[in-house]
Amino acid sequence: MATKILIFLSFVALSSAGFVWVDDDNNSFPKLRQLYVPPLPQPPPLPNIPGLPQPPPLPQPPPLFGFDFSPILPIPPIPPIPPILPTPPFINIPAPEDIKNIKPKPGQFFNGISVKSRSGYALDKDGNRVKTGGTAVLINDNGEVNETIVGDNPPKFEESRKESSSN
């Protein structure tokens, strides 16, 4: 056992024989700088009372060390990225009355369709829930207007103009 300890100590002595442990203040590692730590504020002094000692000042925090990145070049600002998709143009959607009243001139063509539907539940005379509603379809095929209504309580296209003007 003593032989193992002696061999171990000789390896330690040989490996550190070339190093001199000198305390020096020069910055052997220039990127490591001492960071500023502001001092702690001291409490106000207590009134002088005979027989009562004053408390000692608060201890100050130790200095912090960190890397100094000042020699590194600053990062340039990133230029703004243009939008990938273009802004779509404003589309004017005609009201059902507009579709109904369009009459194409000679050499022009127009096809328009408007669909409005509603569904709901109501109570019949016996108190049972009954599904109500319907659909109204307006088609203008080159000036020829066809209006189809399906269901027991379909919406009317005139109602759509009132709803859109009240919103």
From Swiss-Prot:
Residues 145-167 are annotated as: Disordered. Residues 1-17 form the signal peptide. Sequence repeats lie at residues 38-46, 56-64, 76-78, 79-81, 82-84. Keywords: Glycoprotein, Repeat, Secreted, Signal, Silk protein. GO terms for cellular component: extracellular region. It comes from the Eukaryota. Residues 155-167 have a biased composition (Basic and acidic residues). Coiled coil: none annotated. Glycans are attached at residues 26, 146. Disulfide bonds: none annotated. It is found in: Secreted. Produced by both the posterior (PSG) and middle (MSG) sections of silk glands. This is Seroin.
